[in-house]
Amino acid sequence: MKIATIAKYVDQPMILNKLDNKMPKLLILAGGTLGVADSIKTAKKDKKNAKKKLVQNAIIISSTIGASLLGTRGLKIRNKKVFNGLMERVDFSKLQKMQTKAVDKFLDKVQVSDKDVLNALNTAKVKELSPKQIDILTNKLPESPAKEELFSVILPKKKNLNSKEIFSEIKRLSLLGLVPVVGGVGGGIIADRLTNPSKNEKSSTSAKKRIANKVKEGLYQYLANIFLCNVGAGTALFISERLENAKKIKPLTPMKKLVVILSGITATGIIGGSYIANYVSKKCIDPLFGEAKSKKLYSERKPEALDIALHADDIATAGILSGFKWIEPALPFMYFVSGYRAGIGYRNGKKDNEQDKKVRVS
């Protein structure tokens, strides 16, 4: 089976619709599994705080997932749209009507006698095409304006973004990443207030420290793992487009474009992201919460293996900017860990930091 056929298969509007509809369930399942596993781990090491950890995890995970779903899907109350989501969504029934109309219009213009082609066209009216049916339509239908118009609906080509569209998409993707992080920080602060009531000045100072950690980790996750990577991807793609227009480089294929984007992500996000995030925390957030200045930039938060793993969402960003639409429904799932880590106020630099000790509750 050709790679091009697989790419067309997963980028079908009806496949994207199914992936989008399954994402909330997968997100809730993943979040619930993480919360239960972490709570069980805490119970084994610190039974006294096990219940508290369970409550905190439930609040943080719920707020992160809730914010993510609101951001992607928008809000509707009594069938009235309050605000739109950041991801384009089309009802399956509407897709069926659109594809049925496109197929009928094609058959009005072109006579088709091949049974395999007719079966594939009838399938396209109600559900996604199989890889075999995609090959049949691609190879057996002669090239014509009618075929091109049909394929623009049932098998749309990857969109080649121009510079203006690139930065518009970067803005949207950055907002998609920001929403779960804000949800995680907000949920973390609420969870902390509910499970750690301030009884005296000492506990009040400790609570302030925990809030500061959540804000700093939220900033770290957003800048290092999301925003700066998006900026790097967009900038690299913008520069390559300018070079291509000036005939300095050959036209970029989708795979070459992917390499260019990943290079931009590596330069700005993976290499410079943690430095910039920690620098902003030291200069802005620490003074805001009255924390003592530290000479070492990585005294509280240093990059680790999981941070590299979290850059899987940057590969997804690269895929979207390169025109691979099937990746987009998975973005809320990929951003979830960033939101959760922000919510618990994860810190790994100081040995005496309470978030670094797994037996303690964030």
Residues covered by each model-derived region:
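Glycine-rich, hydrophobic membrane-spanning regions of integral membrane proteins that mediate transport
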Residues: M1-S362
